[in-house]
């Protein structure tokens, strides 16, 4: 299930970075499964990459907002 940007914006930076770490580990596992041929849903790699991009976008927004203060 894709992450909602509104939910991500409500999180603080620490939570976002923790979630980012989780997704990066998940992506690594999915890639290994893909190479081994045991991955059934190949779209999950694409969805995980998009979730990572969403989190990085929100982290960038929050960083810019804090820099302006």
Swiss-Prot record:
Domain of life: Archaea
Example GO molecular function: structural constituent of ribosome
Disulfide bond found in the keyword field: no
GO biological process: translation
Entry GO terms, CC: ribonucleoprotein complex; ribosome
Pfam families recorded: Ribosomal_L29
InterPro entries the UniProt entry points to: Ribosomal_uL29 (IPR001854), Ribosomal_uL29_CS (IPR018254), Ribosomal_uL29_sf (IPR036049)
Keywords: Ribonucleoprotein, Ribosomal protein
Family to which this protein belongs: Belongs to the universal ribosomal protein uL29 family.
NCBIfam families named among the record's database cross-references: L29 (TIGR00012)
Protein's UniProt name: Large ribosomal subunit protein uL29
Name of the gene encoding the protein in the UniProt record: rpl29
């Amino acid at each position: 299930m894709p992450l909602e940007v509104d939910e991500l914006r409500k999180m603080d930076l620490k939570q976002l970075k923790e979630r980012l770490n989780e997704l990066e580990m998940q992506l690594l596992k999915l890639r290994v499964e893909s190479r081994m041929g045991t991955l059934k849903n190949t779209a999950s790699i694409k969805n995980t990459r998009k979730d990572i991009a969403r989190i990085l976008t929100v982290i960038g927004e929050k960083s810019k907002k804090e820099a302006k203060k």
